[in-house]
Amino acid sequence: MTPQPSGAPTVQVTRETERSFPRASEDEVTCPTSAPPSPTRTRGNCAEAEEGGCRGAPRKLRARRGGRSRPKSELALSKQRRSRRKKANDRERNRMHNLNSALDALRGVLPTFPDDAKLTKIETLRFAHNYIWALTQTLRIADHSLYALEPPAPHCGELGSPGGSPGDWGSLYSPVSQAGSLSPAASLEERPGLLGATFSACLSPGSLAFSDFL
């Protein structure tokens, strides 16, 4: 057998491969040559776009929206401040109304000399304090005088000052604290002249002026 040249089989193989596998078009050949974009590059591009152009548009929109919403927010704040101020004024008005009503009711039970005397708020409170103190001292004197042979009738100046120490207030007359003592109503029924004389000596307009209670 004669040796065949080395180039012949290679030509046949290449022709057979060309027949079995048709040649791809130029477009199909060029597509695979271009490498697919890596995910890291796409992420990097998106990040750069967000840093650059993607963030520019929202900033402009925010600036426009912020400029338009400023008057609305200021208007809402002013309305809210007005409503709060109105509520605070209403609360203060109601508080003063209740206080004035209570002071008027207190003035109605306090004896005044003359009757048409108009007391201020602080004068009403001081007069009520001193008047309650005088009544308490009178009841204490009447209660202690029931068991004495000769009931003393001390002068009102010896009773002490209404603005004394808190210990003086603790020693005042109390129907519950003193066992066996008669109630003020029983004292008045048994000895009606005793309390009247003591009370008139301490609270009569002739002995004490109205300014002494203020």
Swiss-Prot record:
Residues 57-70, 79-88 have a biased composition (Basic residues). Changing residue 93 to L: In DIAR4; attenuated NEUROG3 function in vivo. GO terms for cellular component: chromatin; nucleus. The keyword Heme does not apply. It is found in: Nucleus. CDD domains: bHLH_TS_NGN3_ATOH5. Residues 1-98 are annotated as: Disordered. Residues 1-14 have a biased composition (Polar residues). Pfam families: HLH. Keywords: Activator, Developmental protein, Differentiation, Disease variant, DNA-binding, Neurogenesis, Nucleus, Transcription, Transcription regulation. InterPro entries: bHLH_dom, bHLH_transcription_factors, HLH_DNA-bd_sf, Ngn3_bHLH. Efficient DNA binding requires dimerization with another bHLH protein. Interacts with ATOH8. Acts as a transcriptional regulator. Together with NKX2-2, initiates transcriptional activation of NEUROD1. Involved in neurogenesis. Also required for the specification of a common precursor of the 4 pancreatic endocrine cell types. It is linked to Diarrhea 4, malabsorptive, congenital: A disease characterized by severe, life-threatening watery diarrhea associated with generalized malabsorption and a paucity of enteroendocrine cells. This is Neurogenin-3. It comes from Homo sapiens (Human). The gene is NEUROG3.
